[in-house]
Curated annotation (Swiss-Prot):
Keywords: Cell cycle, Cell division, Periplasm, Signal. This is Tol-Pal system protein TolB. Coiled coil: none annotated. It is found in: Periplasm. The keyword Cell cycle applies. HAMAP family: TolB (MF_00671). Residues 1-20 form the signal peptide. GO terms for biological process: cell division; protein import. It comes from Francisella tularensis subsp. tularensis (strain WY96-3418). GO terms for cellular component: periplasmic space.
Amino acid sequence: MRKIIAGVFIFVFLISNLYAALVAEVTTGVIQKPLVTVVSDNVVDQFPQQVNSVIVADLNHNAKLQANDTIKYEIKQKQNIPWKSLKSDYVVLTKYTNNSYNNYTVEVQILKRNDTSYLQAITYKNINVSLMRTLAHKISNYVYQKLTGNQGFFLTKLAYVKVSNPYARYGRLYELIISDYDGYNKHVVLRQTDNPIATPSWSNDGRYIVYSSYSGGSMGVYTLEIATGKVTRITNYKGINSSPSLSPDGKEIALALSKGYSDQTNIYIMNLSTKALKRITINGINTAPKFSPNGQSIVFTSDREGRPNIYVASVNSKYPQSSILSTKIHQAYEPNYTPDGKNIVFMNQSSRTSGTQIADFNLANGSVTNITNGKADSSPTVSPYGDMVAYISTNTRGYSSLDMVSLDGDNHFNIETADNGNILIQSPSWSPKNF
C-alpha cells in the first residue's frame, strides 16, 4: 500500500521523464499586438527606472500587448513625445516627484498616437521605495485594463512545491512556496522533511491553500491558512487521499480517494462543514479533479478506457456518471478550466509523440491546440483572468523549471529554474485574484 501511495506523489516526476522525439503540434496565428512604450520624466533617478522596467516586463507577459521602454528619452510633457521614432501605438508617461527620502508621488498618463488628449491618468501618492514592485504591478494592471478592457493579473500569486534531495532515502526537503506571479518575493509558507507536499490549490478568497501530504504513516488532505501558517488535517481515510480542489464557493472540495488499500481511486466531493462525501466516479484510476467556474461540473483524469484521458461529470447527478471530453485526445492529464469556462487546459500526450505538452481544448468547437512544445511539460494552472498558463517544464537532463505561456501560445517566459537535478519544482497553482 505504501508503494501505491508513494506512486501518487511521484506521478509528476514520472511523466517528466518522457523524452521521446517530439513532433510539434502548435497551431498559433501571428497577431500584431499594440506596442506600448513606457517613458519617464526622470532618467537619472534609479527608482523610476526600476518601476518602468517592471511595467515593461509585465506588459510583455500577456497575450494582448507588447511593450518597450526608452531610457534615453526624458519626456516631461506630452508635446515632446517623439512619435515617429518611437513607432508606438500608445505611450505610458510616468512622472515622479521625490517628496522626501524614499518617498514618491507617481503620476501615470496614457496617450494614444495621433491623439492630443490623455486617454487616462492616475496618481499614486506617498509611495515608499520598498513598494517598488507592488507599485509597478499596480500601474501595469491599470494600463492593461484601460487598453484591453480586461483585468490585469500582475498582482496575483503563484504557489508551488520545491523539493531538495528528491532521490535521497532520507533528508528530502519539501517546501511550499508563494511568490509574485513573475517569481519575485518568494516566501516559504510550509516546510517538511521526508513528508511530501503535493497538488496545492487555492481557496477562492485567497486565504487558504489545500494540499495533500503523507504524514504520520498515512496520506491526508490538509488546509494551510496563509496569514497564520495554521495547518489542519481534513481527511483521514485509509489509502490514497489526494488531488484536492476547492469549489468556487469554498464550501466543498473535490478529491481522489481509494477508501482502502486499493490501486483504484475515485472522485468524491466533500462538504467541508459536515464532512459528508458524495461519490462522483466508479471504476479505474480517477484523479486530478477541478471544478468548473460555476461549480456545476468537474473535469478529471481517468484511465477507465485503457489510457488516461479527460472526463467531465456533473456535481448534481444522483448517481456516479461521467463522459469523455473528446475522442480527438489520445492521452491527457491534469485538466483545468479557464475562468470563463470556455476552454480546458491540460497536459497532452498525442498519438504522434511520447512527449507531453500543454494544450488548450476549445469547448465550443472541439479543437485541440498545443501551446507549448517542450519534451516534458506538465502541471498547467491558469491565471485568474485567463490570459496566461503556468506549468512545469523538464528538459532532457531532468532539470525542471516553472514557466509561463500565453493562452495563444505566443509568449513564453521562465519564472524559476532548478539549476541541477538535485532540486525539483512541482505543482504550481495560480491564485484566484490580485492581492
